[in-house]
Structure formats: structure tokens, C-alpha cells
């Protein structure tokens, strides 16, 4: 199995699947506080990746239906990537949409950090497909949420069985840095403070 230490800011892309205003309400395993924390962590990884110069691919599904637009936090943090997002017309496994798969391939990175809403429907299928194609994938569980707690458990089992590790954002970012002398560390520490990540850690976050 690949290890987080194999991923670096210079060889990794961030892929966010269906973090939409309607879809987040379908993450039934999460309560309101946990959904707010998810928004904080997805903003954290998005802003960090942008500051570190990592390629970012966004995709959404059926924006004019109940799923809605991507989270406002992502629209604000990633205006350029939001403008280039892959808007799927109903394809459930994002990897089955050639525009999405080609956008990921076009990053030129073989290491992918992936998160999705919901975990069981929107993250697992494209993560498995990307891994099957030969990408190294790590799934970020605190920017993902399943329809049910059982769905979350099954999702992690499927990912692990396919050799895809699961991580949370903060330790994954420190692993990407490798050394606090990394130039991207400035963004890391600034975001830890400005987004209240340190406060969440000190208070014992619930994700």
C-alpha cells in the first residue's frame, strides 16, 4: 500500500468531487456541527493546495437539480478552478465522464488526494477507477461524508481493500510538507490560525 510520505506538494494533485450545497445535506452520518467542520477542512486543503501550487480539479453533478452549486467556500477559495470545474450531466462515477478523467490526467500528477460528497456514492467509485488506472490515491475522510454510518464503514473497507489509504487533512498536509522549512509552511500555519483549525484540535473536533 502506498504511504502518505510518498506524496509531496510537487507531485500531487487535489481532486474534489461533488462538494455541493445540496449534496452535503445527504451526508446523513454527519450532524450539523460535523458538516460545518467538513466545510472548514475542505477550505483548508483547497487553500493550502492553491498556495502550494498543486493542481486542483473540481467537479459537480446536476447543479440545476437538488445537488446545487459547489460550496460557496470553494467558489471563494478557488475562483479559477471553480470556473473550470467539470459539470457532469448525471454521470455518477465521475471517472466515467471523459472530461473529468481527462482533467485529472492533464494535471500530470500520479498522486491524487481525493475527497467527495457523499463518500459512498461520489468518492469511492472514482477513487477506485483512478487507482485501477494506475494513479496513487489517498482518500481524505474529513472532507467526505457518507449517507449513513454503515455506508461510511463500507466505504473505508472498499478503499482499503483496493490499496487506497484513508487520511484526514491536517496530518496529510504536514506529510505533504515533509519539513516545516518547506516554503508552503507559511500558508499552512496561516490557515491553521485563520480557519480555526488549531481551535478545533484543542477542543477535540468531532470528525
Positions of predicted regions on the chain:
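Active-site acidic carboxylates
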Residues: 1-89, 136, 153-160, 177, ...
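Substrate-gating cap/lid alpha-helix
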Residues: 144-164
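Generic recognition of short, well-ordered alpha-helical segments
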Residues: 69-70, 98-99, 125, 150-154
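Internal catalytic-core helix/loop-beta-alpha segment
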Residues: 88-132
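A short glycine-rich beta-strand->turn/loop micro-motif centered on a GG-aromatic cluster
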Residues: 113-116, 136-149
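Short gly/pro/ser/thr-enriched loop/turn and capping motifs at secondary-structure boundaries
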Residues: 93, 120-121, 144-149, 173-175
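Short beta-strands and strand-loop turn motifs
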Residues: 59, 137-142, 168-170
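Short acidic-hydrophobic, aromatic-tinged amphipathic segments that line or gate anion-handling sites
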Residues: 86-87, 165-171
